[in-house]
């Protein structure tokens, strides 16, 4: 029998710096990325270092609830 495919889910990553420092910016907005994670291997929240076009640098993007 084949294994079920519900271990891999789509998650949304959001810039943690844009949420905290939304004041005094040239561009206003929040950077978001869509990726996948395996729930069996990473049961806790995912955090990746990605480029934020609003902060103009690489920042930590954390998983948010849908």
From Swiss-Prot:
One of its GO terms (biological process) is translation. SUPFAM superfamilies: Zn-binding ribosomal proteins. Signal peptide: none annotated. Its main location: plastid. It is found in: Plastid. PROSITE patterns: RIBOSOMAL_L33. InterPro entries: Ribosomal_bL33, Ribosomal_bL33_CS, Ribosomal_bL33_sf, Ribosomal_zn-bd. NCBIfam families: PRK00504.1 (NF001764), PRK00595.1 (NF001860), rpmG_bact (TIGR01023). This is Large ribosomal subunit protein bL33c. It comes from Epifagus virginiana.
């Amino acid at each position: 029998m084949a294994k079920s495919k519900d271990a891999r889910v789509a998650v949304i990553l959001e810039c943690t710096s844009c949420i905290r420092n939304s004041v005094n910016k040239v561009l206003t907005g929040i950077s978001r990325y869509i990726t996948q994670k395996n729930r069996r291997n990473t049961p806790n929240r995912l955090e990746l270092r990605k480029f934020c076009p609003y902060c103009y640098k690489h920042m930590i993007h954390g998983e948010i609830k849908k």
